[in-house]
């Protein structure tokens, strides 16, 4: 797959953000790797009230799209990805990425619930807990790093 296809098909999903800063950091990282679509699910508190409008501003300025949905199940149902990767410190190796894929990070740095992980596959990005934004950065770099100038 060429870089343009990868940037169109790799979709970061920022799940359950509670902090404005964590939400915006994940959005900025995603935009920095040139992704064309970013999804936010289950935003709560100030992340929902202040972070979402600011995230929309950043995404629109970059020419990308932001989708805000209530839940991960809706994301999988509507976007119909070929694979859903829940990024973490445990799990399987990601392997080769092809087609439309979702990279899901838990923005409140909690563990994913079993009902959430049942929608895809838990993958190990790094064996240490470095936070959700760092996990997203490492996963995007693994897949899109060669596409970024």
Language model features: what each stretch is:
Residues 1-149:
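Post-transcriptional modification and biogenesis factors for structured RNAs
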């Amino acid at each position: 797959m060429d870089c343009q296809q990868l940037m169109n098909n790799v979709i970061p999903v920022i799940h359950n953000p509670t902090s404005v800063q964590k939400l915006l950091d994940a959005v900025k990282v995603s935009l920095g790797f040139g992704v064309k679509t970013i999804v936010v699910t289950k935003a709560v508190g100030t992340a929902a009230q202040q972070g979402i409008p600011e995230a929309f501003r950043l995404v629109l300025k970059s020419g990308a799209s932001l989708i805000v949905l209530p839940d991960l199940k809706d994301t999988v149902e509507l976007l119909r990805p070929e694979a859903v990767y829940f990024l973490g410190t445990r799990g399987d190796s990601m392997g080769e990425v092809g087609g439309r894929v979702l990279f899901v990070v838990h923005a409140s740095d909690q563990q994913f619930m079993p009902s959430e992980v049942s929608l895809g596959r838990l993958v190990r990005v790094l064996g240490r807990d470095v936070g959700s934004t760092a996990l997203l950065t490492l996963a995007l770099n693994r897949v899109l790093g060669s596409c970024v100038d």
